[in-house]
Amino acid sequence: MRQYVQVPTVEQEKAYDYNSAFEPRPCMCLGVCCCCAALRPRYKRLVDNIFPEDPKDGLVKADMEKLTFYAVSAPEKLDRIGAYLAERLSRDVVRHRYGYVLIAMEALDQLLMACHSQSIKPFVESFLRMVAKLLESGEPELQVLGTNSFVKFANIEEDTPSYHRRYDFFVSRFSAMCHSCDHDPEIQTEIRIAGIRGIQGVVRKTVNDELRATIWEPQHMDKIVPSLLFNMQKIEDID
């Protein structure tokens, strides 16, 4: 006669015990994060490396040299470098992290001076958008910073000038700066001088790019001439 052995109830429950609170090991998540960081495009990693942890330390020169070498060696990446720098700068302007804004513009100035290839045109468009962002800010320091960068750009002779590029915004903005009414006399003077320098830069750049017909159009002259005469009158009043 067959004999059956009954399995204890406790053992049955134990055999099918399921731990619903099971979670993956943290180290696996960290590994995935590390992989994601490694997959970031090289140009983004090179750009990120030029920014120190403390903006007071200034531009990381060794990493800036690497970024410049990469940009010169791979000019087709210039537009992406410019777009990414513009993204970072816009974010830092909104967050009032002006130390990093200064570093970004210094990097842009160096890249403009180093690169003169056909591929620089898309990069210049990103650069001009960033300059416009600074000029539109209500911070005199950023307005002067943007003007200085634009003047440096105006002194650069591009290998192939862009005939479709227009500077309407900059004519209007620099002309408005010439009429600054800041309550602080020193800041007011600083902004007005920056406006005059900006107008000079626009004229120089349009002449170099053979866009003379554009700059002499009435809609531009109606802003430039009164702005210059206004400041000349102020100088005479002081004298």
What label would you give each PLM region?
Residues N19-P24, P52-T68, I81-R88, R97-L112, ...:
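HEAT-repeat alpha-solenoid elements in large eukaryotic scaffold proteins
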Residues M28-C36, L67-L78, V93-R97, C115-V124, ...:
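HEAT/armadillo-like alpha-solenoid scaffolds in large eukaryotic assembly and transport factors
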Residues R42, L46, Y84, R173, ...:
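Charge-rich, solvent-exposed alpha-helical interaction surfaces
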Residues D48, S90, D109, V131-A132:
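Amphipathic alpha-helical repeat scaffolds
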